[in-house]
Swiss-Prot record:
Region of interest (Disordered), ranges: 273-320
GO biological process: tRNA modification
The protein's name: tRNA-specific adenosine deaminase TAD3
Family of this protein: Belongs to the cytidine and deoxycytidylate deaminase family. ADAT3 subfamily.
Gene name tied to this protein: TAD3
Length: 400
């Protein structure tokens, strides 16, 4: 990597694997006569559905080169991973063997659905599978323009500034941004400990990115060593081991991670700017969430993030304006990969994209330990990116 360049890496829904090294599982299969195919498949779908292998085609068809006849092979059911005995087939499946002249054997099929055409081509060499390219198009998955990259890097600089300025030890920081107008909606740091007094979250200010002058980067994360103990997402249970000032117990809370506080700040802002409850979105009438939905509209200036603007946002709103629904369409920038709790909170808030600088190898929820963006059962999915901060770029920021 160029030591003077910022690099933005997409973190996919599942770990990257070589197309020719796909995980497989064992299944019982058998050649079948074409005239029995429909009947056998109908029985198998009832008694042995392949719920976890929906990407795998139940029947494999092959044209025999010698005679041109069609050869059909059907998956009967899953097989035990550590046992190759045909007698372990479920009784309901075994009852199909004699009537339909089956000859069961054990073979392999790919465990996961392909996420690229290259993976699908390799999978089909083992057993035919289905491939469904993503139907959504989140900005950035296919790469960023130079202008977008600069904007992302500037917001990440705000995160670094917040994390290192006035905090000993280092804390995590979160900045929620409306990408449609490149404005900061909320910016907060960890408030798990009493030393991190909560900020006033009733301000109606929504501000564009501003140059913040010198950023005090005394050291990179790699050199912080023991100073990482206060990063709430890195050590979710560390708070329980620390002494707390009971007289100021209202100033700390074990769940006040940077992401959670930023969400609270964004909500307080919305309540202040859109006080009329009749204009609030009815959750029952919100359109289905999808990852390419536009950022929710705000009454904000569309100025460039480089333009200085110290004025507060107008608190008097057009009566026709409706209160936005949560954080739909927003981006969030974090110093550290969020823990599972914070990652799930960002799902509920309908965040569109997450950018973080450093992986969370102990409790990360977006790639390092868990991978929440790949959980199919969730009703919303965001795109996740890691922003690599080379040392040269960090040193350059200290001289702005």
């Amino acid at each position: 990597m160029d030591s003077d360049a910022w690099e933005i890496i997409h973190i996919p829904e599942k770990p990257s694997l070589s197309p020719d090294h796909q995980p497989t599982v064992k299944v019982y299969a058998s050649l079948i006569k074409p005239r029995f195919a429909n009947t056998i498949v109908r029985h198998l779908c009832k008694i042995a559905p392949l719920e976890d292998l929906r990407h795998v085609k139940r029947v494999k068809k092959k044209i025999l080169p010698d005679c041109g006849e069609t050869q059909l092979t059907v998956i009967l059911c899953l097989a035990p991973e550590h046992n190759d005995q045909l007698s372990d087939m479920p009784p309901d499946v075994q009852r199909l063997v004699d009537p339909y002249e089956l000859s069961p054997f054990i073979t392999q099929v790919c465990k996961y659905a392909a996420v690229s055409k290259e993976e699908w081509e390799e999978q089909s060499k083992i057993w035919p599978t289905s491939f469904h390219p993503p139907t959504y198009n989140i900005d950035g998955i296919g790469g960023f323009s130079e202008e977008e990259t600069q904007s992302i890097c500037k917001f990440m600089r705000v995160v670094i500034d917040m994390a290192v300025s006035g905090h000993t030890p280092l804390v995590n920081a979160a900045v929620i941004v409306d990408p449609s107008v490149r404005r900061i909606i909320a910016s907060e740091t960890d408030q798990v400990y009493a030393s991190s007094a909560p900020r006033d979250m009733t301000s109606a200010e929504t501000r564009p990115f501003e140059e913040t002058g010198e950023i005090c980067l005394n050291d990179t994360l790699e050199k912080q060593n023991g100073s990482l103990s206060a990063l709430s997402c890195l050590n979710p249970w560390q708070w329980s081991l620390q002494p707390h000032d009971t007289e100021n117990c209202s100033q700390w809370h074990p769940l006040r991670h940077a992401s959670m506080v930023a969400i609270e700040s964004s909500s307080a802002r919305d309540r202040n700017l859109f006080p009329n409850p009749s204009k609030i979105f009815d959750q029952d009438h919100v359109p289905p969430s999808n990852t390419d939905s536009p950022a929710k509209k705000q009454k904000t200036s569309s100025q460039s993030p480089d333009v200085q603007n110290d004025s507060r946002e107008e608190t008097v709103r057009d009566p026709s304006m409706e209160r936005p629904y949560l954080c739909t369409g927003y981006d969030i920038f974090l110093l550290l990969e969020p823990c599972t709790m914070c990652a799930m909170a960002l799902v509920h808030q309908r965040i569109k994209r997450i950018f973080y600088a450093f992986p969370n190898t102990t409790a990360g929820g977006l790639g390092s330990v868990h991978r929440l963006q790949g959980e199919k059962s969730l009703n919303h999915h965001y795109a996740v990116f890691r922003v690599l901060l080379p040392d040269d770029a960090l040193r350059q920021m200290t001289t702005v």
